[in-house]
């Protein structure tokens, strides 16, 4: 069961990470009462010409830098899935590990969500396309421009995580009240 992380700060910040071996998207949001406030987003570019170890280190170092810039209390990444290419899934798993290490080093709780769950929470459709995720991101945050779909995906992961944390906190309060 997830709990809201304890933080001295009034408004909790969460980071969503969309891992990839070439581009890893990230987005930081903050609860603002009943609303969600966009804080920042970007892409960690590992490049496609470096060897595997160099790419993983690049992802790790860039995410460390991002995490240090914000007051992140909790993080979420997308679960890996195997579609048709098991080797691609393995590589994605390695990129996910770099993201988890960056969060873990900073003592940030990491949650994982299936891609269809993220899409369902964010767009209302579990099989939403990348374009539909980007459109929903622009509707929810009209003043934010994303240079790549990886940023919008990371935002969707962060929003999904924030909603899940709030839902679990409300359920825990209701259970305690009922006992």
Language model features with spans:
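Phosphate- and other anionic-substrate recognition elements at nucleic-acid/protein interfaces
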Residues: 1-179
């Amino acid at each position: 069961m997830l709990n809201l992380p304890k933080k001295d700060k009034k408004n909790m910040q969460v980071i969503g990470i969309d891992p990839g071996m070439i581009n890893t998207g990230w987005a930081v949001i903050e609860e603002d009462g009943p609303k969600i406030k966009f804080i920042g987003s970007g892409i960690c570019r590992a490049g496609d010409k470096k060897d595997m170890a160099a790419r993983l280190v690049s992802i790790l170092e860039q995410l460390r830098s991002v995490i240090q810039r914000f007051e992140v209390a909790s993080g979420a990444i997308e679960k890996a899935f195997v579609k048709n290419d098991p080797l691609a899934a393995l590589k994605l798993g390695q990129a996910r590990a770099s993201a988890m290490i960056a969060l873990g080093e900073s003592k940030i709780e990491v949650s994982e969500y299936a891609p269809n769950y993220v899409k369902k929470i964010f767009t209302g459709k579990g099989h939403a396309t990348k374009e539909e995720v980007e459109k929903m991101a622009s509707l929810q945050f009209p003043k934010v421009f994303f240079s790549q779909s990886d940023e919008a995906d990371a935002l969707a992961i962060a929003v999904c995580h924030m909603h899940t944390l709030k839902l679990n906190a409300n359920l825990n309060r209701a259970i305690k009240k009922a006992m």
